[in-house]
From Swiss-Prot:
GO cellular component term, pick one: chloroplast membrane
Record localization: Plastid, Chloroplast membrane
Native species: Oltmannsiellopsis viridis (Marine flagellate)
Name of this protein: Uncharacterized membrane protein ycf78
Stretches the record annotates as Disordered: 411-447
Chief place where the protein resides: plastid
Keyword Kinase annotated: no
Length: 808
């Protein structure tokens, strides 16, 4: 592709020289042009390599690839540049259109107050008076007109260097915005600005002018392609014949933009001022209070717009922008750093395990639930506020106990000299020095009640330290192996009935009851759960009786599976069943859940009950189900995944299909293959000295997989497949079997009588095998070579497009 473009450019250079110069081209002219072209091409190529422009073009390859394909098909190898759709310099000039009116209309999109510069100008107009507002508005209009004028008149020395400094220009804009907001927020008093304060007005004009060139936090970038003209953007460009027309056309367009921008800016300012007056009138609030609130709101919204533009210039853009990439370039998606690396080992957060780190982080790392901790943490525990408030209680108590947690990370080292002080086994000297006159010491205070030696105490502390340091790893290994669908008592200890645990359970109940008794929270929770359950297809949902029957059948099947377990033979099988809450295999569950989470909160709040109400009457409500059965949306389809245990009707009727279908119009031939050393049956057009067969087959009933097999499905002895082979060549006069041979449906070629002897000799046979020469000899049409040798005309046989098959 590069070579073709280079040759085409070289030929265009020679063609232009030929059109420019009169007369014929000399060899010297062609040589000079060739050398000049090679030198220019070499310079462009070196610059292309050094500037890394090739790296940017590689990123554009997915966009250019369709254009390359179209160019190859059209035999036109000249491609458009990426900017050809943005700036069209070769449109047909329209001398009748009024560029002033077009600029006047397009200025509406420039005057919409949706940028930070417009908000600051509007604040100056309301707070600092009319002169400050008009000065700020004129600064914005001047900045917009100067920028568009520089683009229209092609002032490259100003536009290209300015955009080449990006994102430095953006940082300058952020600095200006923060400076303006800081000055406005720290004003000693809010006062209007007079016309006599010329330096301050010039400062306001300059800041507004610079903000127009630097500020990017606006909606204008999303309205850049909105224009009332026939061009792609507001940057209207036209082609004219003379320089005078060029200046007149673009100056009239700029004048229209300026006049319309002033007009629409005044219009928007007047409308906003009337809106504020109406709000003050109907709110019955003092004007000073409304102005103070408006000042705070504008400054806050301005700062918010500035902050929202920061992600546009990310760290990746700062590194890749010099290489020609844009922000959030799709070409860099596969090379970005991964932010969803899972915790494969399971030790993330173990050092701070005392704090509650089980926060919902699945949008970031797509992590799994019920892992990395010794207690189950479900989807509801991390997302429902009533459950999450209780589980994250340690986070709120961290500030109170922070001074005591320093000992956990900087533990005090134990030594043998400190052990007697810890257990109370003090030395006599220390006891005598520590006892005041008249004080009596008990046996425990004297250390007489302790029977453990210092060595035993040291070993006990070593065991405790080892157990404390080993518990996190054991908990992780246990969390990876166990399934957290055990009974709740599996995770409780013998201290669960302690007074402290009972009091803690009461506190938990009161806290959760506060959430669940809130009408708004209750309505939102019901809406969330109902929305999840309603994901099942409504048109094909089971009715209440079918759900009840299905649930009962699943319970019976689950109980039956439980009876097949080996642990049923244990003497304490009932306690085993209660403790582990049934088998742990998902295939044996009553509900095979196919979604994120376990919905244990749903089980607690919306219990499943198929027995009926409190009076024993059967309810007709639907059973709450957690599985998502699949349905067949095509009624005409014979296959269905509908619950077959609920369908009392018969299965699909049987369908007759032939035992074997021939997919080729050619007949079958059988014979011995010397290469494969086996007897084969084939439909390929292969030459055989003796080949041919007839398959008389009977149709066989092939029942569906769902129907029960009966005796009629088996083929009887009389319907067995019969294979009858006929040897070739065949004579109708041999054995008086002409009638049987003529009934064959196999194609054959009748050998003329004058060729009888030649054909028989070519086959290596004797004439006596076929009687006299007047006998009719029939041969299969696949031995075409022998017919050509004997010069026998045969009809053309077209072989099948498929290669056929060889059996066995």
């Amino acid at each position: 592709m590069f070579f073709v473009s280079a040759v085409k450019d070289y030929l265009e250079v020679l063609s232009n020289i030929t059109d420019t110069l009169t007369g014929t081209l000399s060899f010297d002219t062609i040589l000079k042009s060739t050398l000049l072209y090679l030198a220019t091409s070499t310079k462009v190529f070196v610059s292309y390599i050094i500037s890394f422009e090739w790296f940017r073009n590689i990123s554009y390859l997915p966009i250019i690839a369709p254009d390359l394909s179209k160019a190859i098909l059209r035999e036109n190898y000249v491609l458009d540049t990426p900017l050809s759709n943005l700036f069209t310099f070769f449109d047909v000039p329209s001398y009748t259109s009024n560029k002033f009116v077009l600029g006047l209309l397009n200025s509406f999109f420039l005057a919409i107050p949706i940028s930070v510069a417009h908000l600051i100008a509007f604040r100056r107009f309301i707070i600092q008076g009319l002169p400050a507002g008009l000065t700020a508005g004129l600064g914005i209009i001047s900045g917009q007109v100067c920028f568009i004028g520089a683009v229209l008149f092609g002032v490259r020395s100003l536009v290209i260097p300015w955009f080449a400094t990006e994102p430095l220009s953006y940082l300058i804009g952020i600095f200006l915005i923060l400076t303006i907001i800081y000055d406005m927020a720290h004003e000693s008093r809010i006062r209007p600005i007079n016309l006599s304060e010329t330096p301050l007005l010039l400062k306001i004009f300059g800041l507004s002018f610079l903000l127009t060139w630097t500020e990017q936090s606006s909606v204008f970038q999303y309205l850049a392609n909105v224009t009332l003209g026939n061009q792609a953007t507001l940057l209207e460009t036209t082609t004219v014949k003379t320089d005078g027309q060029f200046l007149l056309t673009h100056i009239s367009y700029l004048l229209g933009l300026t006049a319309g921008n002033i007009l629409f800016t005044l219009l928007f300012g007047f409308l906003l001022l009337q809106l504020i007056n109406q709000v003050v009138k109907f709110s019955n609030l003092p004007y000073s209070l409304c102005v103070r609130n408006l000042n705070f709101g504008i400054l806050t919204f301005t700062l918010a717009l500035s902050i929202t533009s920061i992600p546009y210039y990310g760290f990746d853009y700062l590194l890749t922008a010099p290489l020609g990439f844009v922000s959030q370039d799709q070409s860099l998606e596969k090379v970005s750093l991964r932010t969803n690396l899972p915790d494969a080992i399971g030790y993330l957060g173990q050092l701070s395990e005392s704090k509650y780190l089980d926060t919902e982080v699945t949008p970031f790392d797509r992590g799994t639930y019920l892992t990395d901790f010794a207690t189950p943490k479900t989807y509801e525990s991390l997302n429902y506020q009533g459950e999450y408030f209780w589980n994250s209680r340690l986070d709120r108590s961290a500030s109170v106990t922070q001074k005591y947690r320093a000992l956990e990370f900087n533990p005090k080292k134990d030594s043998e000299s400190e052990i007697p002080e810890q257990v109370g086994a003090l030395s006599p000297d220390s006891q005598a020095n520590s006892v005041s006159p008249g004080q009596e010491l008990s046996e425990n205070e004297l250390g007489l009640g302790t029977t453990k030696t210092n060595k035993q105490v040291l070993l006990n502390k070593l065991d405790q330290n080892f157990s404390r340091n080993s518990n996190p790893s054991y908990a992780n290994l246990l969390s990876e192996v166990l399934d957290y669908s055990f009974n709740e008592s599996f995770f409780t200890t013998s201290a669960s009935n302690a007074p402290q645990e009972v009091a803690l359970q009461k506190i938990e109940f009161n806290i959760k009851q506060k959430y669940y008794s809130n009408p708004l929270y209750k309505a939102l929770l019901n809406f969330d759960i109902d929305r999840f359950i309603s994901h099942q297809p409504v048109a094909q949902r089971l009715n209440a009786n079918q759900e009840k029957q299905l649930f009962e059948n699943r319970l019976i099947l689950s109980t039956y599976y439980d009876t097949l377990r080996d642990y049923r033979l244990l003497p304490y099988s009932s306690e085993f069943q209660t403790y582990f809450n049934g088998p742990k295999s998902y295939a044996n569950r009553v509900y095979n859940q196919q979604f994120k989470g376990t919905l244990n909160v749903v089980r607690r709040l919306f219990a499943i009950d198929i027995e009926g109400d409190s009076a024993g009457r059967s309810t007709s409500n639907s059973v709450l189900k957690f599985d998502q059965p699949l349905f067949n949306n095509f009624k005409d389809s014979s296959l269905s995944v509908y619950h077959e245990e609920l369908n009392p009707e018969a299965v699909r009727p049987t369908k007759k299909s032939p035992f074997l279908e021939n997919t080729s119009p050619t007949p079958f031939y059988a014979g011995w293959d010397n290469i494969q050393r086996k007897f084969i049956v084939t439909n390929r057009l292969l030459a055989r000295e003796a080949a041919g067969n007839e398959i008389n087959r009977a149709s066989r009933n092939i029942s569906s997989a769902t129907s029960a097999l009966t005796a009629k499905d088996y083929t009887s002895l009389g319907d067995t497949v019969k294979l009858k082979f006929t040897s070739w060549p065949d004579s109708s006069s041999k054995g008086g079997n002409s009638k049987g041979v003529n009934q064959l449906s196999l194609p054959f070629i009748s050998v003329p009588q004058e060729k009888f002897t030649q054909v028989v000799s070519s086959l290596g046979l004797e004439d006596d095998d076929f009687g006299s020469a007047s006998s009719t000899l029939k041969l299969p049409p696949n031995i075409k070579k022998m017919f050509e040798v004997c010069q026998i005309s045969i009809p053309e046989v077209f072989p099948p497009k498929r290669g056929g098959f060889i059996w066995p």
